[in-house]
């Protein structure tokens, strides 16, 4: 059973997901929300290793705008995709939206399972 979920980067939709998961009893690690935002009942985790050890990693929609950094408007520092990719728990399931082909290939090369939200018919427009 998946128990630990990391929500990394993104906008207010990601915070809503984190709150809903926490309310369902999941242990939620929130990362990349350390600038100019009120977290209310959530806490932002600063230990990247702990965040990347989660069973599930939830990335934003879109995962990236530039192909190099995670979409993270509330992070103090840019979050470089390659810095995260090499440290993700290999048995984790990664979710994200509009995952670019180079990131998909890197996940596949590292044998990391992933799902793109926008590949689901009910979520794409």
Give names to the regions the model predicted.
Residues 5, 28-31, 114:
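Hydrophobic anchor at the start of a short beta-strand
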Residues 5-16, 21, 125:
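Glycine-rich adenosine-cofactor-binding loop
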Residues 24-40:
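NAD(P)-binding Rossmann-fold cofactor-contacting core
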Residues 40-53:
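Short acidic low-complexity segments
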Residues 58-124:
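Glycine/serine-rich phosphate-binding loop and adjoining beta1-alpha1 elements at the start
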């Amino acid at each position: 059973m998946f128990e630990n979920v990391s929500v990394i980067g993104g906008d207010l939709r990601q915070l809503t997901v984190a709150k809903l998961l926490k309310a369902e009893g999941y242990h939620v690690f929130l990362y990349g929300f350390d600038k100019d935002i009120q977290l209310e009942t959530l806490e932002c985790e600063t230990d990247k290793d702990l965040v990347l050890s989660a069973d599930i990693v939830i990335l934003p929609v879109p995962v990236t705008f530039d192909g190099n950094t995670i979409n993270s408007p509330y992070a103090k520092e840019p979050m470089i995709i390659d810095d995260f990719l090499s440290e993700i728990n290999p048995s984790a399931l990664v979710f994200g939206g509009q995952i670019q082909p180079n990131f998909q290939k890197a996940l596949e090369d590292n044998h990391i399972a992933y799902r793109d939200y926008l590949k689901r018919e009910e979520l794409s427009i």
